[in-house]
Amino acid sequence: MASAMRSLIEDDSRYLKSFKLFLERSTEHQCVQEFIHNVLPDILGSVGKGKTHLNVIGVGSGAGEVDLEILSELHSRHPGASVDNEVVEPSAQQLQDYKALVLQKKDLDYISFNWNKMTATEFEERWRANKMSKEADFIHMIQMLYYVKDPEATTSFFQSLLSKTGKLLIILVSGNSGWGKLWKTYKNQFCNPEISQCVTTADIQSFLDSKGARYQSFELPSQMDITECFTQGDEKGELLLDFLTEVLEFSKTASPELRAEVMELLRHPDCSVESNGRVMFNNNLGVIVLD
């Protein structure tokens, strides 16, 4: 990343603001929910067969909305089983929101929540240091592998925790998405070298293929309205640009040349389609399910 530009994740408040706006402007949650309710139940039906207690790990759980939907589907497939749910999330605000959501919900008596305010890497270090032997029946890592140094090693570690019938669910942006094109073009300019911000499911699949690993994969069509990005000085447009580039205050810190190039690419058919005066960015997600 160019020295004048800082990573968006260095400012938790602005990151959360831009992330919430991204969710409002995109069909991300809807397409993930459709997958959870229409495809995931059959996958969950095959985990922990006959067990009366299931171990779940949510890595990068955020504010918990998606976690609770997954746990609800798991419960419908294994109604008699109690669940031990490890929540791994480094943001204090997100964890607070998750806990508040749990308090609002009824019928969660079958779940015990273990709150881990830490990164995936810190969780792995603690797990290894304590020589934990507990196996997981289901692990989900949704939109979080961008924030680790080595996504392949993180994937391998969590896969190693699975029980015999356990499954690991990974959701990231698809290699065929606008993100894939954007990151391929500008990885060196605005991706933080300390983490793997520019990783897509195509990268993870290449790694798994090189190991000869078996997995299922799915593509989830999604769009994001980025029209506001093209109005100079628009506050929401600037937030969306920060989220797209993962650069803090991108419009103010990028050179005019880089900004112009990025804006041109965002409008390019490889990244977006224009419809009814709106610019709709290809936000397709990829899903990988590992045994």
From Swiss-Prot:
Swiss-Prot/TrEMBL GO biological process terms: histamine catabolic process; methylation
Residues given in the record as S-adenosyl-L-methionine binding sites: G60, E89, Q94, I142
Pfam families: Methyltransf_23 (PF13489)
Disulfide bond positions: none
EC number: 2.1.1.8
UniProt GO molecular function: histamine N-methyltransferase activity
Keyword vocabulary terms for this entry: Cytoplasm, Methyltransferase, S-adenosyl-L-methionine, Transferase
GO CC annotation terms, alphabetical: cytoplasm
InterPro entries xrefs: HHMT-like, SAM-dependent_MTases_sf
Location(s), subcellular: Cytoplasm
Main subcellular localisation: cytoplasm
Domain of life: Eukaryota
Enzyme class: transferase
Residue sites binding substrate per the record: E28, N283
Gene3D superfamilies: Vaccinia Virus protein VP39
Chemical reaction(s) catalysed: histamine + S-adenosyl-L-methionine = N(tau)-methylhistamine + S-adenosyl-L-homocysteine + H(+)
Keyword Membrane in record: no
Primary role: Inactivates histamine by N-methylation. Plays an important role in degrading histamine and in regulating the airway response to histamine.
Subunit comment: Monomer.
Protein name stated in the entry: Histamine N-methyltransferase
Lineage of source species: Eukaryota, Metazoa, Chordata, Craniata, Vertebrata
Gene expressing this chain: hnmt
